[in-house]
Amino acid sequence: YPVMGAGQVAPQENVSARIAQVLSAFPQVEGGYLFGSFLEREDFRDIDVALRFSEAAGSPAVLRKLASRIGRELERALSPRREVDVRILNASPVAFQHAVVKRGKSVFVPDEAGRVRYEAALLSAYLDYQETLEWFNRRFLAGIP
């Protein structure tokens, strides 16, 4: 991103603030993360947002509808308008969740203790899974069926 002058807000900070503002209207959302090309490059195509929903938020179908609605709200809230791709962390593989938490940016945290509990449990699950994942990767790279 270009160098910002005094008093200017960097694009990532502005987008992060707008995302947090929109997400605060949805009590079912327990956390929001930015991830992907928006954080890594100037020539990003869309803005990737991962959401963690409360367990009481509803069935997978309800969560998909809610995520779609939130995506539309985020697109309307951003200026200039950008395409927003929303992923549901609760329904995603552990490896994806870990990648988002590790390389992404937390932009909405209504409950810091809840975020810490989630990320600690996720790290534990990922470390348990990591050995199996590495085994699969070795077999795949070696071309073993």
Identify the role of each PLM range:
Residues Y1-G31, L39-E42, S54-P145:
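Catalytic core of pol beta-like nucleotidyltransferases
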Residues D48-R52:
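Short beta-strand->loop micro-motif that forms the acidic, two-metal-ion catalytic signature
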